[in-house]
């Protein structure tokens, strides 16, 4: 996987909602942004540059703009020179404020993109932070099929040829939705959430042995696909092995987990052999996961009932005598 990153040019080109207007520094549009954090350089503009986060996007709001306007020409030039001694990826003025002339001159000289936007500072920071969080999120690739089953993002894994795509195709025919086939791109958007998606090239397509490449959106309609989905369940399809059949889960009391990018996801292993209806088992697993999220564990409830029954039977069989 390539190292997550985004260029200034990509932000300018793909996100019209930011209302960015390039003032100068177009030669630096190829600068890469590698931090999702935003910096408001208020303290640095007073001359204190210790711990200056120059690797972040620099946002100058009303406060910074008003402070720079209050400085004498000599002091403004001094602060500007110190500020532009650092390598900066880009600078953005909010509220439609016009950048000070020394800032424009230095940005042009250093090749640092300088923007302004009509959006208020707080709103702008919220918007661009969401963009950076998505673009710079830790990510990995997994071989499998990601499908939404009863609202649960279900990642089907298993060795090649075990029947992942065929199972997913049957689920799609039943009304569930495809997210990604073959290679699933997984991003961690927070400490506990994983989002799965597909590359632009493979999106909405599946490979079925004997049929080739299928466009699921064209075959089953727009309601049969979606671009991304929260991963809430991993189901590993594994060929049935008689010698290890006793190792398969029989009660479901304990929930197995698999870790991806530091996030633990519920994990189920389903043995595959002729005669087993795997799609309906996957549907049932997804519905059961929804129940678990709601705090209802059928296996534990049954275990509690069984323990109560055994205790009552023991008392009836061996009554306590005075």
UniProtKB/Swiss-Prot annotation:
Binding annotation for ATP: 158-165
Keywords, sorted A to Z: ATP-binding, Kinase, Magnesium, Metal-binding, Multifunctional enzyme, Nucleotide-binding, Serine/threonine-protein kinase, Transferase
GO biological process: regulation of carbohydrate metabolic process
EC number of the protein: 2.7.11.-, 2.7.4.-
Superkingdom, natural source: Bacteria
Keyword Phosphoprotein applies: no
Listed cofactors: Mg(2+)
Pfam families, alphabetized: Hpr_kinase_C, Hpr_kinase_N
Positions of Mg(2+) binding: 165, 207
Subunit composition and interactions: Homohexamer.
Further remark: Both phosphorylation and phosphorolysis are carried out by the same active site and suggest a common mechanism for both reactions.
Function: Catalyzes the ATP- as well as the pyrophosphate-dependent phosphorylation of a specific serine residue in HPr, a phosphocarrier protein of the phosphoenolpyruvate-dependent sugar phosphotransferase system (PTS). HprK/P also catalyzes the pyrophosphate-producing, inorganic phosphate-dependent dephosphorylation (phosphorolysis) of seryl-phosphorylated HPr (P-Ser-HPr).
Protein name listed in UniProt: HPr kinase/phosphorylase
Gene for this chain: hprK
